[in-house]
């Protein structure tokens, strides 16, 4: 079964989630989201396109808006020092047909599961982190304990078909897939080279296209 989830990254002026975790992002015309995205691509290149990815489902609160979301993420960034966390993205629905309704998604990209688990354990004991969650609970609440985890790989990196968007925005589509009977992870990985070759033999220049699995 295939489920389609269309989302739009909320970055730049709205600046919902897009963040370089070790840096603060100013919300003005000098926004550096594009630089942060370039740093993310550099990190992926250093890992051969591999990442440990986690997705948290989030619910918008009664005070959710661009200004409050920006304040929330700016405050969060000041609490994060983990070098193993090299990519953070946020998604909001871009179509009424979104398979997940009005759910927001917060994506974390780590170097490894072990490093991610260690940082989550530290976060659970972080009093400042708990205070932050309480302060902004009317803006947005995310299900950290119920996060979905994946071993991810980017066969085609985001800068392959054009420079990254300086604003930090990008449009994404997600397909939720199940193994057919008798198939496994090895079969899924064996599928990737053929699909990647098909993309490379097509005209995607200037689109900024990339994909992850």
Residue map of PLM features:
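Short S/T/G/P-rich N-terminal loop/turn motif that feeds into the first structured element of a domain
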Residues: 22-105, 109-213
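Bacterial N-terminal signal peptides that target proteins for export
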Residues: 2-9
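C-terminal motif of bacterial Sec signal peptides marking the signal peptidase cleavage site
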Residues: 17-20
């Amino acid at each position: 079964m295939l489920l389609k989830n269309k989302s739009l990254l909320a970055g730049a002026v709205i600046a919902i989630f897009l963040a370089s975790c070790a840096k603060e992002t100013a919300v003005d015309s000098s926004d550096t989201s594009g630089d942060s995205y370039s740093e993310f691509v550099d990190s992926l290149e250093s890992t051969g396109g591999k990442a440990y990815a986690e997705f948290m489902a989030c619910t918008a609160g009664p005070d959710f808006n661009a200004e409050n979301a920006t304040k929330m993420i700016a405050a969060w960034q000041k609490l994060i020092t983990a070098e193993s966390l090299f990519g953070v993205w946020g998604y909001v629905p871009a179509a009424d047909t979104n398979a997940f309704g009005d759910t927001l998604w917060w994506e974390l990209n780590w170097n490894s599961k072990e490093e991610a688990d260690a940082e989550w354990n530290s976060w659970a004991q972080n009093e400042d982190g708990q205070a932050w969650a309480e302060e902004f609970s009317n803006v947005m609440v995310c299900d950290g304990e119920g996060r979905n985890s994946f071993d991810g790989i980017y066969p085609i990196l985001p800068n392959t078909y054009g420079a990254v968007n300086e604003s930090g925005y990008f449009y994404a589509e997600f397909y939720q897939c199940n193994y057919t009977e008798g198939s496994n992870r090895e079969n899924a990985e064996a599928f990737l080279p053929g699909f990647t070759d098909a993309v490379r033999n097509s005209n995607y220049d200037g689109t900024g296209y990339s994909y992850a699995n």
